[in-house]
Amino acid sequence: MATVREKAAALDLSALHSPAQRPPGFSVAQKPFGATYVWSSIINTLQTQVEVKKRRHHLKRHNDCFVGSEAVDVIYSHLTQNKFFGDVDIPRAKVVRVCQALMDYKVFEAVQTRVFGKDKKPAFEDSSCSLYRFTTIPNQDSQLGHENKGTSPSRFSDALFKSSDIKSDSLEDLWENLSLKPTNSPHVSTRLSPQVINEVWQEETIGRLLQLVDLPFLDSLLKQQEVVPKAPQSKRQPDMVNTSNYLDRGILRAYGDSQEDEWISAAIDCLEYLPDQMVVDISRNFPEQPDRTDLVKELLFGAIGKYYSTREPLLNHLSDVHNGIAELLVNGKTEIALEATQLFLKLLDSQNREEFRRLLYFMAVAADPSEFKLQEESDNRMVVKRVFSKAIVNNKNLSKGKTDLLVLFLMDHQKDVFKIPGTLHKIVSVKLLAIQKGRDPNKDTGYIYCQRIDGREYSSSIQKKTKDQLLSLLKTIDEDSKLSAKEKKKLLGQFHKSHPDIFIEYFGDSF
């Protein structure tokens, strides 16, 4: 039986259901085609936009996987940007249920690994540690292509559920179960270039960060907007030395894959960023007894710690933000600090972000008190903090206490700090939709707490407020019993000279 993914591919949904190829007069409320279109576009968007690559999950390496939190980010962004349900505010929890439905209908599946001898329950998790893989049935590709050739989009809803054991009356029923109601108005949009989308994300991330963190200067953030991503360096042609280095890395990677030890797996992942000579030294000094994991861990921790003690700090950009986040932590505003950290890390380029993610994961595992004892006289958590603090933040304007607090906070929340906040998703979606519809994208940015008014109204408001304040000042002078008659007369005379109209309005012509 074919899966949804094969049937979607056979129908060529990437072209048929792209935003630029919507049918004339399309409305999401149309049944059953409306819901069919939404599901098809969600599947296509997920398959084309989520990052699929080789990842680790509970001690083992798995090919062609994506993480749960990124799937939620992609679908959430797609639903809100395309306004399938009008202006309804879609909570992240609802998107998690959409992902659960897609998993139930075999669009993708959870990576099956055993933890303590038990299979993980097939429940979708919005986590950077939960891995999923798209389902495929290679033997049926040609058959599906022939079988579905010429299938109309209106019949896709029937085909969608034939491959599933789960009973459902229609696609519309599932939307109703999710408490989401489609909009009745047609929605027409055009494709936006990746450059425009990236610029909007960058701009709104900075804008939201400024809303959460009090910064004395904006120079660092303004410079951040001007940063141009560096072009990746071309790979060198293999020679004898490079081949040897490659083999050393391959041997260490193979060793890591063979070990059912999360600590070693996390450490091996960090070796990818170490220079070749250090990797060669690790390989040459590897214990003759590989089962002596204590010696292996001691070697790996020492090498990784040595490299990051001399490396430029990963988070040394936007140093003013460090103080802002640390101040939030000092004041007990953990949730706001977490969102600010998520925004801060969103501004990292992809390479540094991935390197920091691996390092932070290794730090969190190594800091576990039940893991390998790093130093006999010290707690693992304190050792990790001491060794890697300068590799993360080395800010002269940040006190040692705040630096320690920030590093420990990152370690404790390493599963959440790389998620994209739902608030940012909504802000970006509103702006992208405005651009798509040709409206002023700055009219409703999502984080301005005032109402836009025209010039005449602004001028009138200024005059009224000024007049009210002058009348209040005049009343204060007139009713102040502490002023002597001479002093009061002097002040009133000065006021009359400067603002005669206000003076006459208050006292009249009889004064």
Curated annotation (Swiss-Prot):
Q: Which PROSITE patterns does this chain map to? A: DEP
Kindly list the biological process annotations in GO that this record carries.
intracellular signal transduction
Span of domain DEP: 46-136
Q: Which SMART domains match?
A: DEP
The similarity comment for this entry is:
Belongs to the DEPDC7 family.
Q: List the PANTHER family hit by this protein, alphabetically.
A: DEP DOMAIN-CONTAINING, DEP DOMAIN-CONTAINING PROTEIN 7
Record-given protein name: DEP domain-containing protein 7
Q: What is the lineage of its organism?
A: Eukaryota, Metazoa, Chordata, Craniata, Vertebrata
